[in-house]
Curated annotation (Swiss-Prot):
The keyword DNA-binding applies. Keywords: DNA-binding, Metal-binding, Nucleus, Transcription, Transcription regulation. This is Transcriptional regulator PUL4. SUPFAM superfamilies: Zn2/Cys6 DNA-binding domain. One of its GO terms (molecular function) is DNA-binding transcription factor activity, RNA polymerase II-specific. CDD domains: fungal_TF_MHR, GAL4. It is found in: Nucleus. GO terms for cellular component: nucleus. GO terms for biological process: positive regulation of transcription from RNA polymerase II promoter by galactose. PROSITE patterns: ZN2_CY6_FUNGAL_1, ZN2_CY6_FUNGAL_2. Transcription factor involved in regulation of the PUL gene cluster that mediates the formation of pulcherrimin, a red iron-containing pigment composed of two cyclized and modified leucine molecules that acts as a siderophore, a chelator that binds iron outside the cell for subsequent uptake. The gene is PUL4. Disruption phenotype: Impairs pulcherrimin production and subsequent red pigmentation. Disulfide bonds: none annotated.
Amino acid sequence: MACLECKKRKQKCDGQKPCRRCTKLNVKCIYGTDRRKDKRKIKDGSNMFIFKNQTLCNDKINGIVPHPLSHDTITTKETWEPSYPLFSDDINPADIISMENTDGSIPLQFDLDFTSLESCDVNDFLRLIGDTFPANDADTLDMNQMGGFNTPSISHNTQDDKSQIAIQRNRLIDVIFGDDSHTPPGILREHIFELSERHEDLEALDFDDNGKFLLSTVLCLGALTLRKRELLNRDSNQPSTNGIPEVAAGAYKYYTIATDLIPAVHAAPNIDGFCGLVLMANFMTIMIPLEGQLYLSNNALEVAVALNFHKRESYDEMIVSNPAQLGVFLLFWNLWCSSCMLATLLGKQPFLTLDNISLPPPHQMQHTVSSSPLSINFMRLRIQLATLQTKIFQRLYVYGSLNKVLFQEIETELSLLSTQISNMKCYPIYDEGLFYRSKVLMLELSCLKAHNAFLLYRPNLIQKKSLHAVDAAKHIILEIWSHYTKQFPKNEKDLVDHLDWNFSYPLRTASLTLSISCVILQKYQQSLNFLEEYGIFEYNLALGVLNDLIQVVPIEKRLINLLTVSRTTVEDANESNREDSLRFWTNMLMC
């Protein structure tokens, strides 16, 4: 197995630790994850599960047979074997993600299986981003033969080559920062341009791996966004061009550079490295399954914890020392909310709870943070919904105790949040850009509200005590359908016209929400012997929209496959669990 430095230089490696080449160059010798070994890591005497055999190109997730443990086992921190559980009505405590390392004192680890392109060619990469090209071009394609986005050593470039690379980079950076009202929080355009000038050769050896990593992720996300716009604007009757699209080649190139830098970033992270990891968690939503997305988000959170971004003291210090960087705390909150949503909907314990965060929420931060009131109010409600979602999951599925009084308190809290969301939707907006941005944000809040209802009323649906979950599923399907259905042509035009760097997150949320809603309706349909299969109107609407959304994010086809897989026997259910990202929900169908 070659070390990362030899891989980057495309040289043979002797496999020693350190290898001869790294010793000669006097650089740190780092090896990626060995796919021949079990990916479980020992952490404080416990096995911390690292998803096994998971690569960018894997279509299947291989699980391990779970070992049921009592809740006492977790509280006493005894050794347990985390796994992919076959969920029953309750959560298997053995599947809860480790809550250790919340103070950043333990060395961080990163599983490169989630991001490595070692076993992938360009064809795999393009397939994941929804791109295609003639197969015979893929067979002979080499990394240094891809379009105009080559990044060879600058020492061999003419001045014209340098100018061309600068123009290409500026174009991709402008894709990310073109709309001043919606740019990645905590990342400044001027800083990215400065990094671009400083690192003319992204593959050169220097001491700013975090800066190169951030620049590479920005350029990759810019290229992905640009290519997605090109694909959505392309005439379906127009024949495909020969060769690799230039922008797609650039995305592949910058992605490879970024992933090679991950070990160095994790070894000594700073603000640039954290921002780069959050951006990578963003665009990886179109490339890896939900479990991988959760793991990637948790790794970024671990870096944030190591940098103390979750603490009030760090915020207070930055107000004085570097107020221009306060947006990084908004980035932290965005990441935390996304992580909570993914964790609870996948039947996992969130990595970091609100009790361990002393950082003030966005609406309590000083006005030096450059964000619109709409975004700040959205973040306030989003944090409240994520907090409630975590509370529901812990009380109902981890501790298994939710008496009538507490249940009614949570219902009241959810009702109050629903009222606040309704009031926010009624706020008058007449600016065109803000109008379309608000539509996306309001739909996101509606989805998050539905997630809370799904978790809260899931047991009642299984026990046939109430249909609150069914009602929530029907309502959110109609709202998502009205936003994305191609039966209304303007929806498709709006998606193309307003597609920006953050396109993957809203589409991921919509697809995930529709899929869970469909499972809930399937469970409801099982109780109606007189109703034929696919006889629920909203279910058919949801499937139609999901089929439209996978044209933009192809990996979400997995979710559609989960809705149609046979689960007539326990054996069928066990087999489907190997690929089932939503087994926490689909296993309801076997109850």
